[in-house]
């Protein structure tokens, strides 16, 4: 079968036979992955980046380790393992930390300053069904409480016959933290975050936000101004004739004076990098996609929330725009906002979050710091999740005999630093990079 796949993800493009890069309706580059995906400067001009394996290879070469170009992670792992073995690398005992041997299921870990701060959202034994009536939920609950342990999974499981979107979820969000929510499609993430400001009110269990009980209709209405939710593709929330009117909609609904509404509109647009004077009178649908998304963000920020809930805010963005929005969210967090972010990108969660909660079949599967969660690649794989690209390569290198800590969270930069120390500190054997007949030719950017 012939396959043509469109993607923003370079690791996916690396698996193709050929790659065509488009810009403004024209083919900007075309060739094999090895010919295209290592051209860092040209890709950057097209708002794209290199695969993590190429970034790691380039970082190692800059540190004096002459590894060959590899666009696929498995090939880069094999290349580094070859260099390590060639240098006479001896096995080094790396002691695992306590978290290495600890299963993550429903675990709870303390995380930096946020662990000591006050709770802003407290979820206790929350369950939700989109299909069961109150009477049916009580009947189901009675069955589940009388069932033995072996049958409870069948009663509560997220199989096609299960009516439960959330199952007995207990969770605390603390002031000032950046909490990530991960999980496969259908795991309950979006249902959970819609409970955080009362868009969905609790059926069973409780949700308290900023001291207000969201089972109360009055309290749920009051908390909406303080817990802002930005949905996936938030630009689809835009509706007004001008940018200023759209951003002003929420504050006006609060009954604020017009001078305060105007202040909030200008302030929130500035926080997302937009100028009220330049675009305030424009129709939001005349703006670029990235600007539309920023306007939608501004509309939520104009409510001056204490908690910002983001449901896959980078969905559909190219790598450059993705980086811009991650920078924006990080800046808002550093300004004091508590952030809860749903994402399918393990790299984004690893780079941004203080703590990660993993959902599976409507329940909390794991909870911990990024390092604690991503140290358990096999457990995550069992529920259809991966780990960040640098972490994948570090774990694969450890399995290949390169002495790396499996309980440490690696970025590409940190992994390159540690590998350079290992590879350059091995026995005094000259480093060489074989370009053997039949091997993939080095590219112009990477070289051998």
Positions of PLM-derived features:
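The feature captures the beta-strand-to-loop junction immediately N-terminal to the Walker
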Residues: 182-184
